[in-house]
């Protein structure tokens, strides 16, 4: 399999030292030349637009659909802030893909909990972010496979 120019570029960026200055990161991001003054630079078309950091000094997330629903907008903003906060506060990272289980809703819910979106105040955020994913966010596998639930059902049926 032949690597594309983009694949080579991604590998080079991931291999960079974690102790880079912003200027070194800028040089690496633009492949050795300063593209921060180009408004429509090709590096801006990713979910996380770092071109915006060098061009305007802001961070831009380009992975959300437009919406007028206040709850969905709040959920998207909260998710972006939580991921940004984790990136700032995290001391170590591991570039490893998490395998998607047969239940994407459960996998994403555990990710949200790891980000700190726990508790009643984030219940609505989790609901909006999980509503379109297939599967049960509370259970990794089908509920009927859990012995504890089967025992509970049996006890309830015997009590009747």
Regions inferred by a protein language model and the residue ranges of each:
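C-terminal accessory/tail domains of diverse enzymes
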Residues: 1-160
């Amino acid at each position: 399999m032949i690597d594309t120019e983009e694949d080579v570029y991604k590998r080079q960026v991931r291999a960079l030292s974690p102790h880079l200055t912003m200027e070194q990161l800028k040089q690496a991001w633009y492949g050795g030349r300063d593209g921060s003054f180009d408004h429509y630079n090709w590096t801006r078309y990713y979910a996380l637009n770092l071109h915006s950091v060098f061009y305007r000094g802001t961070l831009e997330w380009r992975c959300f659909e437009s919406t007028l629903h206040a709850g969905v907008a709040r959920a998207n903003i909260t998710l972006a802030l939580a991921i940004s906060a984790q990136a700032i506060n995290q001391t170590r990272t591991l570039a490893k893909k998490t395998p998607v289980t047969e239940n994407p809703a459960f996998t994403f819910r555990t990710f949200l909990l790891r980000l700190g979106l726990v508790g009643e105040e984030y219940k609505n955020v989790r609901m909006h972010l999980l509503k379109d994913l297939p599967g049960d966010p509370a259970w990794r596998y089908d509920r009927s496979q859990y012995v504890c639930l089967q025992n509970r059902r049996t006890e309830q049926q015997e009590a009747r």
